[in-house]
Amino acid sequence: MIPNNTKFSNPLFGRILTAMVTPFKKNGAVDYELAIKLSNYLCENGSDGIVLCGTTGESPTLTWAEQHNLFVAVKGSLNSRSKVIVGTGSNCTSEAIEATQKAYEFGADGALVVVPYYNKPPQEGLYKHFSSIANAASDLPLMLYNIPGRTGCNLLPTTVNKLMNFPNILSIKAASGRIEEVTELRAACGSKLSIYSGDDSLLLPMLSVGAVGVVSVASHIVGLQLKTMIESFQKGEISIALDIHEKLQPLFKALFETTNPIPIKAALELRGWQVGSPRNPLTPLIKEKRESLLQIIQNLSL
């Protein structure tokens, strides 16, 4: 069921969505039991919902069967208590359509659909790609995902505005690293599009120009702090929000010192969550960066 509109005051997916890591056992298999425990912990500690099988979840190295089993495990545990959004994007339109349709069939609350990567389609190709997905899964709320640093392709606000004709395209994860992206999207699309920051470090600045929340990596370990920051901003307690924003900057920076999700997996292990190493070709965090990350975590009294 697609709502008639999405309100700035009450976004469909909530304010804080954790882009959850995929836990692996020592033998490299997905640890579904730990994924259930982690997702429940996150939703009890600040997160309004979980994004599975995104960048942080190492979707490029998960089989479709693993992605399906991961969703079934997590959604079955959380049930209706929290939103579960599934990454269904691909640089092959037919593959993305199939994945998005299956996400709907198995009860996902929404799908995160990334801009096609590597083949770098023009804007008309991006429009056709996303419109085809929206038509094929018309009852599933969709969140577009613009991350040109990874895809090599930028989804322009004018193209997003054209896509707003599809009632199930309700939101976008803006991860270009540019605060101006929010302003440009709001100028093109108005308030009918819910814009989520795709960068923890830019959450507060993006809130100030119209974003509704964040698809977060740091919320694995500072979800409650992020929740307080957003609530303080909403109440006009800007000095409190700014204080949290500034205190968390060293952590935000450390979590992206190297390729995500390498640092956040290390941070979780330092907090006692044995989520395993990333799958090849990603590698574990090197010793020096791990020690630096530990110091930051200790300084924050986490």
Curated annotation (Swiss-Prot):
SMART domains: DHDPS. GO terms for biological process: diaminopimelate biosynthetic process; lysine biosynthetic process via diaminopimelate. It comes from the Bacteria. CDD domains: DHDPS (cd00950). Pyruvate binds at T56, V215. Coiled coil: none annotated. Catalyzes the condensation of (S)-aspartate-beta-semialdehyde [(S)-ASA] and pyruvate to 4-hydroxy-tetrahydrodipicolinate (HTPA). This is 4-hydroxy-tetrahydrodipicolinate synthase. The lineage of its organism: Bacteria, Bacillati, Cyanobacteriota, Cyanophyceae, Synechococcales. The gene is dapA.
